[in-house]
């Protein structure tokens, strides 16, 4: 841990407060984040938690050491949506083969897309199909403890039975009673349920559907419910390797540090995960800190296919930001667009709703262009340590205050503190060494452009604008355009201040 590292504080959805982060074991910091269901291309809303928790992963590695942090992000490859996509896309193949084609191709695309967004690979990415044994064992334990029951070849969890026991209460994360949750939720009404709020841990597979040997003495093949998958995978990757699990009766060993995901997962998914894990493992908390990122809109509207504003990560990467022109192979172009998308996302605090706009994406690309131009001009190399990233680290240690971190990067750029800029960008996942060191990147071929002189003229123009001397402001703009430098004016959405960016044209 760096000697000068500030105290990391994170907002905990469970307590509704910002808390000092104290890992269970500083040598084994553990985080689990709900990953994709691999049946279709991931959309930009899916990108947000990937980016947010990648920044946290980087920060934890910076504070505690890379070898002391384990980050698990699951892959859901058992789901009714996968079955439906397989039947639609591969009707002539055996069903299991069709499912494998859907999950393998979709997962490969997801991995390529999130890598282009500048994300590190998680330490482990467990797949649901690889952890059926753990799911069955947890379900058997829940039945034995009287909080789950068998009905018509289903196994169901009973929240009311959980709340009749001593220990954690169902509804603590969502801060709602059973009656309130029932009134506000869409629940499956089924004759085999004892109570409407009971949820499925295991269900029978229909003919032709994928199936596995069932728990709880059920003779037919079946498959797991969504919620038990994450309980089992987090146990397998974050508890059992560190002495916890079903064979452990030490509650502290059966908890990990951080669980993350989108705000839409608070109920029912995360509430149900907590119920399953706490009852099976005998602990008060599945994870000590629960973190959730806010919703995403597109150009001020909810993203939906019916509105025609449904944007995948791949759409963003294919957008063709102007800096690269027609140059570059697809991988390089993806990486540049991915960095711009990452910076655009991080300009909004992770807990706040975000409005995705094409203008913000373009402005982010312009800003990165200027930052990388300075790094190249000053011969910045890939940093081995991040000893000059203290301002960015301090901002991120305040509940991942990415806006304050970006403000620190802008200040470093303004005063030409190359070490602080480059290392701060690295800590946020915004530094791609290729764009710093490659000699053939055309967007940085600006030997005849004096960036500092342009910045001075932009500042002079801003003074004229503030003085309402429009003629002189226009004169500077027109002179720069004649020299091949085009100015673009916009407003900072947070402060309302004018932002002027520039690009070489012609």
Curated annotation (Swiss-Prot):
Zn(2+) binds at residues 34, 230, 269, 273. ATP binds at residue 305. GO terms for biological process: cysteinyl-tRNA aminoacylation. A motif ('KMSKS' region) lies at residues 302-306. Monomer. It is an enzyme of class 6 (ligase). One of its GO terms (molecular function) is ATP binding. Pfam families: tRNA-synt_1e (PF01406). InterPro entries: Cys-tRNA-ligase, Cys-tRNA/MSH_ligase, Rossmann-like_a/b/a_fold, tRNA-synt_1_cat_dom, tRNAsynth_Ia_anticodon-bd. Its EC number is 6.1.1.16. Coiled coil: none annotated. It catalyses: tRNA(Cys) + L-cysteine + ATP = L-cysteinyl-tRNA(Cys) + AMP + diphosphate. SUPFAM superfamilies: Anticodon-binding domain of a subclass of class I aminoacyl-tRNA synthetases, Nucleotidylyl transferase. It comes from Brucella canis (strain ATCC 23365 / NCTC 10854 / RM-666). Keywords: Aminoacyl-tRNA synthetase, ATP-binding, Cytoplasm, Ligase, Metal-binding, Nucleotide-binding, Protein biosynthesis, Zinc. It is found in: Cytoplasm. Belongs to the class-I aminoacyl-tRNA synthetase family. A motif ('HIGH' region) lies at residues 36-46. Binds 1 zinc ion per subunit. Its cofactor is Zn(2+). GO terms for cellular component: cytosol. This is Cysteine--tRNA ligase.
């Amino acid at each position: 841990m760096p000697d000068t590292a500030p105290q990391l504080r994170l907002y905990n959805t469970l307590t509704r407060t910002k808390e000092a982060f104290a890992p269970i074991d500083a040598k084994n910091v553990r985080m689990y984040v709900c990953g994709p269901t691999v049946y279709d291309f991931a959309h930009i809303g899916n990108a947000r938690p990937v980016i947010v928790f990648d920044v946290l992963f980087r920060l934890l590695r910076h504070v505690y050491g890379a070898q002391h942090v384990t980050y698990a992000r699951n892959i859901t490859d058992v789901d009714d949506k996968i079955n439906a996509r397989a039947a639609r896309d591969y009707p002539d193949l055996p069903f299991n083969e069709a499912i494998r084609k859907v999950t393998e191709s979709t997962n490969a695309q997801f991995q390529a897309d999130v890598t282009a967004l500048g994300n590190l690979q998680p330490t482990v990415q467990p797949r649901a199909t690889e952890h059926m044994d753990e799911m069955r064992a947890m379900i058997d334990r829940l039945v034995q403890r009287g909080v789950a029951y068998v009905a018509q070849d289903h196994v169901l969890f009973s929240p009311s039975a959980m709340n009749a026991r001593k220990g954690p209460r169902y509804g603590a994360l969502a801060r709602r009673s059973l009656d309130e949750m029932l009134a506000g939720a869409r629940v499956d009404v089924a004759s085999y349920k004892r109570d409407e709020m009971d949820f499925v841990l295991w269900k029978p597979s229909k003919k032709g559907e994928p199936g596995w040997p069932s728990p709880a003495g059920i003779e037919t093949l079946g498959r797991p419910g969504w919620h038990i998958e994450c309980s089992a995978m987090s146990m397998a990757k974050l508890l059992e390797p560190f002495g916890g699990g079903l064979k452990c009766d030490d509650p502290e060993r059966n908890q990990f540090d951080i669980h993350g995901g989108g705000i839409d997962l608070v109920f029912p998914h995360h509430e149900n995960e907590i119920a399953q894990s706490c009852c099976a493992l005998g602990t008060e908390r599945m994870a000590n800190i629960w973190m959730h990122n806010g919703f995403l809109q597109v150009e001020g509207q909810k993203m939906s296919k019916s509105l025609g504003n449904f944007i995948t990560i791949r759409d963003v990467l294919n957008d063709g930001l102007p800096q690269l022109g027609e140059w570059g192979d697809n991988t390089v172009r993806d990486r540049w667009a991915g960095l711009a998308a990452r910076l655009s996302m991080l300009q909004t605090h992770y807990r706040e709703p975000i409005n995705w706009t094409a203008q913000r994406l373009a402005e982010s690309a312009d800003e990165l262009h200027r930052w990388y131009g300075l790094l190249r001009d000053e011969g910045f190399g890939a940093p081995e340590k991040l000893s000059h990233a203290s301002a960015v680290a301090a901002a991120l240690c305040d509940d991942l205050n990415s806006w304050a971190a970006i403000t620190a990067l802008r200040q470093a750029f303004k005063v030409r503190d190359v070490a602080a800029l480059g290392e701060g960008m690295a800590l946020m996942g915004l530094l791609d060494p290729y764009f710093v060191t490659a000699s053939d990147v055309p967007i940085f071929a600006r030997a005849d452009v004096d960036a500092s002189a342009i910045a001075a003229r932009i500042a002079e123009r801003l003074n004229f604008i503030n003085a309402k001397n429009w003629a002189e402001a226009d004169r500077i703009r027109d002179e720069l355009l004649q020299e091949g430098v085009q100015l673009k004016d916009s407003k900072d959405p947070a402060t309302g201040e004018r932002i002027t960016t520039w690009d070489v044209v012609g």
